[in-house]
Amino acid sequence: MTNSKRRKGLVAASALLGGVLMLSACSGGDDDASGTKGKDTSQAKADEAAAKKSSAADIRITPKDGSDNASINNSAAVTVSKGTLTNVTMTTADGTAVAGQLSADKLSWKPSTQLERSTTYKVSAEAKDASGLVAHENASFTTVSPANSFIGNFTPEAGSTVGVGMPVSINFDKAITNKAAVQKGITVSSSSGQQVVGHWFGANRLDFRPEDYWKENSTVTLKLALDGVEGAPGVTGVQQKTVTFHIGRNQVSYVDAKTKQMKVTQDGKTVKTIPISAGSPEHKTYNGVMVMSEKFKQTRMNGATVGFTDDDGKGEYDIKDVPHAIRLTSSGTFIHGNYWGAKSVFGSVNTSHGCVGLSDTKGANDKGTPAYWFYNSSIVGDVVVISHTGDKTVQPDNGLNGWNLSWADWKAGSAV
């Protein structure tokens, strides 16, 4: 019970006791000074007894009871003064328990998991004061709704090891109009000391990169302090977290569509040269710097998904088990194994629909093929530089390919 509630209880007790004394007087007593003195003495004793029975422990629950736009991060908590917490329960409206952690000194409690959006929670707390008297407090609140909040889905994943070309890319689930406020709530730093700058691609995507590739064997830290930040009118952030990822060795591969060769370098030294087959004259491969964003040991490729269809509307090709596929653009450019083409094609003629093909065998299990070696020597974030294709340079937002912007143009896309 809070102090305010205790005071209300004492006032109620006073009124009740006063009423009893008044009825006794009306029923036939003397109205003298000694009677008034007796009433005052009885009231004082009643107040003293009530105070002794009330716990001094003062429990505070946040968010306050009735809140309907509560944060899902670090907002829910129970604290106590003049006592220690003995029991705290937190449940959703349907009774599902929420795990929590009581501090070692038993003065505070917090949920141990992030809360869900648009969910009503009930909190019940109990505490004892130094005399062993028990206090109780209850509260109910509802977290912010998805309609009134935004989150940023980021890559790479926490704890992952990626190549030197991997940007921090954040995709927001709501259009951001207050870009400066949101960008100020995000920091990206590297153990290498490299300057890192953000660049907006439209209203939903914000990428971060240094001027040159990340320093190999460094650690990058992403801090999101977006809880309560207004990204658009009536739409606030809910994320509050820090993640780190690691940069591996420096692998950059150079594909020359004219010579039809790919030179693979690690830490500046050429480790392998592989014959390739790039896009045909009718379906040229993009030029430019491209970052590996996904890897698939085997995947299906259907021409209809990228606009290559026959007159009947079906894909010009539909290969259900393309081996050793590595994505370079979101529009569908891959570097992958090819088991259906003659081995004489690689290194001599460009025949693909825009991808870069390497000699391979069906099943993706032949360790002796160039595609097997390249796939297993590569990690997400490695760089592939493609040249002499006769086509335009890939757009910087087609995949994770912001390296195709100059440093000046990259910085011009920052909101801060």
Annotate each language-model stretch with its function:
Residues 234-343:
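Gly/Pro-biased beta-strand-loop elements
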Residues 155, 251-259, 404-416:
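Short peripheral tails and domain-boundary helices/loops at the edges of structured domains
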Residues 2-250, 276, 414:
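Acidic, low-complexity Ser/Thr/Gly/Pro-rich repeat segments typical of extracellular/periplasmic
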Residues 36-37, 41, 286-299, 355, ...:
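Short, surface-exposed secondary-structure junctions/capping segments
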Residues 77, 122-124, 138, 169, ...:
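Extracytoplasmic/secreted envelope proteins and their assembly/folding machinery
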Residues 85, 120, 126, 173-177, ...:
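Sec-exported extracytoplasmic/periplasmic mature domains
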Residues 60, 77-79, 122, 169-171, ...:
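Soluble periplasmic/extracytoplasmic beta-strand elements of cell-envelope proteins
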Residues 303-416:
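Exported/periplasmic cell-wall-interacting domains
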